[in-house]
């Protein structure tokens, strides 16, 4: 009998048999039969679901709120090796240590932000603007280019090439109109052209943006007395024309010119505010009540309201015995200005905050107080002793600055200006719509602290208004000198009689 030799494969099979995991079939064969477990009933499942829902709705939220409150009020501890993910305030340049809560707030989402310590904390500086970085870089590049252009213009100015200097500075002013260095160089070029008023304005504007600029202070001290003398001479010229106007013969030609000025004033004062009616259309509305096709009802009502306000000024305010101006006078003018366009807000001080471009007037709770201060200033003895042109211009500016109404502030301010001027013997001042940009620019300069440009603007157009009357009287007809007067048309006579009748009834 042969005996088979044991091989390595037999050993491997033996080990595999010993280490093999029992299969499910082997377990079933060896283990006794177990009873099958029965499932839960439907009633039990429903009851458990209701209990879980009630717990989630009533117990879980207060528990999480309490936990969040504990985390919020927990003491803070320093973690030298960590940095805050959000840094709301200015970045500290002294200490690199950051603060983190002692108990971390639990989160149910994976934070996708990789939190790495910022290595530039010691060299950081606060960012003082909210402009986009691209815009800041663009503005910085413009200012840099403007300064280089100003240096080139300065070299041309010293070499005597003023034309080239002016051309370069116009480019620099277009790039950085508010830069003090640019304004100072532009002022020096204006001064060399003997444009002292414009040069002084450049120095004043430079000081508004940089009050401590020594070069601007020295240059302003040189031009200020010269410009003051120019302003006094200009005001004296206007007063001399006013005296000449006062001695004009009250003829039919003068009355006709007054009627034309009336229509011109209504047209220009509403056109400055954006009204698109032409002078002929404005006149047609006032004379015949015609409705202009293609124009809004509001534009018609603005013209009618200004007509009512002018009649109130001519027939009531100018006939008052005392020359004091009250808050009620201003409110009554405004009530007529907006009486047809916006009767709800007409004659009422605003109760909401308004915004005029980049300018923000006073809050509504201070409007009445500011308006009372303005009226007290108007009626003060020292103010009454001022030049009427200066007083009227400053009163206009103060009313616009307070901005007491939601709409119609500019029209009411121009009525107040003319009320003061006409009480001093001046004819109505027309501020043309063609000079709208100059009008608002001079008011902007007044916001920077210099009222003289706006006073000059009012004086210039007051002189133009008087010259219009004098020129009309001199060129209308030679019959006025001989005592003969041209006859009015039937329509002109009818309108003049209507205005005079209304004035007598109002007084």
From Swiss-Prot:
PROSITE patterns reported for this sequence:
FIDO, TPR, TPR_REGION
Q: Tell me, what's a Pfam family for it?
A: Fic
For this chain the motif Inhibitory (S/T)XXXE(G/N) motif maps to: 269-274
What membrane topology is given? Single-pass membrane protein
Asked if the keyword ATP-binding belongs to this entry, the reply reads yes
Q: Where are the transmembrane segments?
A: 40-56
Question: How is activity regulated here?
Answer: The side chain of Glu-273 determines which of the two opposing activities (AMPylase or de-AMPylase) will take place. In response to endoplasmic reticulum stress, mediates de-AMPylase activity. Adenylyltransferase activity is inhibited by the inhibitory helix present at the N-terminus: Glu-273 binds ATP and competes with ATP-binding at Arg-414, thereby preventing adenylyltransferase activity. In unstressed cells, disengagement of Glu-273 promotes adenylyltransferase activity.
Stretches of Basic and acidic residues bias are at 491-507
Show which residues form the site (Important for autoinhibition of adenylyltransferase activity): 273
Q: What is its EC number?
A: 2.7.7.108, 3.1.4.-
Binding-site residues, ATP = 273, 356-359, 407-414, 439-440, 447
Family annotation (InterPro entries):
Fido (IPR003812), Fido-like_dom_sf (IPR036597), Fido_containing (IPR040198), TPR-like_helical_dom_sf (IPR011990), TPR_rpt (IPR019734)
Residue ranges for the region (Disordered) are 482-507
Tell me the compartments it is located in: Endoplasmic reticulum membrane; Nucleus membrane
Q: Which GO terms describe its biological process?
A: defense response to Gram-negative bacterium
Q: Where are the TPR repeats?
A: 146-179, 180-213
Catalytic residues, chain numbering: 403
* Gene3D superfamilies, per database record: Fido-like domain, Tetratricopeptide repeat domain
Q: What is its main location?
A: endoplasmic reticulum
> Which reaction is this enzyme known to catalyze?
L-tyrosyl-[protein] + ATP = O-(5'-adenylyl)-L-tyrosyl-[protein] + diphosphate; L-threonyl-[protein] + ATP = 3-O-(5'-adenylyl)-L-threonyl-[protein] + diphosphate; 3-O-(5'-adenylyl)-L-threonyl-[protein] + H2O = L-threonyl-[protein] + AMP + H(+)
Q: What does this protein do?
A: Protein that can both mediate the addition of adenosine 5'-monophosphate (AMP) to specific residues of target proteins (AMPylation), and the removal of the same modification from target proteins (de-AMPylation), depending on the context. The side chain of Glu-273 determines which of the two opposing activities (AMPylase or de-AMPylase) will take place. Adenylyltransferase that mediates the addition of adenosine 5'-monophosphate (AMP) to specific residues of target proteins.
What's the family? Belongs to the fic family.
Assembly, in brief, is: Forms homodimers; homodimerization might be required for adenylyltransferase activity.
What is the UniProt domain comment for this protein? The fido domain mediates the adenylyltransferase activity.
Protein name in the entry: Protein adenylyltransferase fic-1
Organism of provenance: Caenorhabditis briggsae
């Amino acid at each position: 009998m042969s005996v088979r030799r044991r091989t390595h494969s037999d050993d491997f099979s033996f080990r595999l048999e010993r280490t093999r995991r029992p299969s499910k079939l082997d377990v079933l064969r060896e283990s006794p039969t177990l009873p099958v477990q029965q499932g839960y009933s439907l009633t039990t499942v429903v009851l458990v679901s209701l209990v879980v829902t009630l717990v989630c709705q009533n117990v879980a939220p207060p528990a999480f709120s309490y936990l969040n409150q504990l985390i919020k009020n927990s003491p803070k501890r320093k973690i030298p090796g960590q940095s805050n993910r959000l840094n709301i305030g200015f970045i500290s340049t002294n200490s690199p240590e950051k603060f983190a809560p002692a108990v971390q707030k639990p989160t149910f989402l994976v934070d996708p932000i990789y939190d790495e310590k910022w290595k530039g904390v010691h060299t950081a500086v606060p960012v003082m603007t909210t402009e986009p970085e691209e815009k800041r870089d663009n503005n910085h590049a413009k200012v840099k280019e403007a300064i280089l252009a100003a240096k080139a213009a300065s070299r041309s100015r010293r070499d005597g090439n003023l034309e080239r200097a002016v051309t370069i500075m116009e480019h620099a002013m277009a790039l950085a109109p508010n830069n003090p260095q640019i304004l100072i160089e532009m002022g020096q070029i204006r001064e060399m052209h003997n444009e002292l008023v414009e040069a002084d304005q450049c120095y004043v504007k430079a000081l508004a943006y940089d009050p401590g600029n020594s070069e601007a202070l020295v240059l302003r001290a040189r031009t200020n007395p010269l410009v003051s003398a120019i302003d006094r001479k200009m005001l004296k010229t206007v007063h001399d024309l006013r005296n000449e106007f006062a001695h004009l013969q009250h003829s039919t030609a003068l009355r006709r010119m007054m009627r034309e000025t009336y229509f011109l004033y209504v047209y220009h004062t509403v056109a400055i505010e954006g009204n698109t009616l032409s002078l002929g259309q404005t006149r047609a509305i006032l004379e015949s009540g015609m409705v202009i096709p293609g124009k809004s009802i509001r534009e018609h009502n603005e013209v009618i309201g200004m007509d009512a306000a002018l009649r109130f000024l001519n027939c009531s305010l100018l006939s008052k015995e005392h020359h004091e101006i009250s808050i009620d006078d201003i409110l009554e003018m405004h009530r007529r200005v907006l009486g047809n366009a916006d009767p709800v807000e007409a004659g009422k001080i605003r109760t909401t905050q308004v915004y005029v471009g980049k300018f923000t007037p006073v809050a509504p709770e201070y409007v009445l107080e500011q308006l009372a201060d303005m009226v007290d200033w108007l009626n003060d003895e020292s103010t009454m002793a001022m030049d009427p042109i200066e007083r009227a211009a400053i009163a206009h500016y103060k009313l616009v600055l307070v901005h007491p109404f939601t709409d119609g502030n500019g029209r009411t301010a121009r009525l107040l200006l003319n009320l003061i001027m006409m009480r001093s013997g001046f004819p109505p001042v027309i501020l043309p719509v063609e000079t709208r940009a100059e009008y608002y620019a001079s008011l902007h300069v007044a916001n920077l602290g210099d009222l003289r440009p706006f006073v000059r603007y009012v004086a210039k157009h007051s002189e133009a208004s008087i010259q219009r009357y004098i020129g009309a009287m001199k060129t209308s007809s030679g019959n006025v000198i001989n005592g003969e007067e041209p006859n009015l048309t039937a329509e002109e006579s009818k309108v003049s009689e209507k205005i005079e009748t209304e004035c007598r009834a109002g007084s």
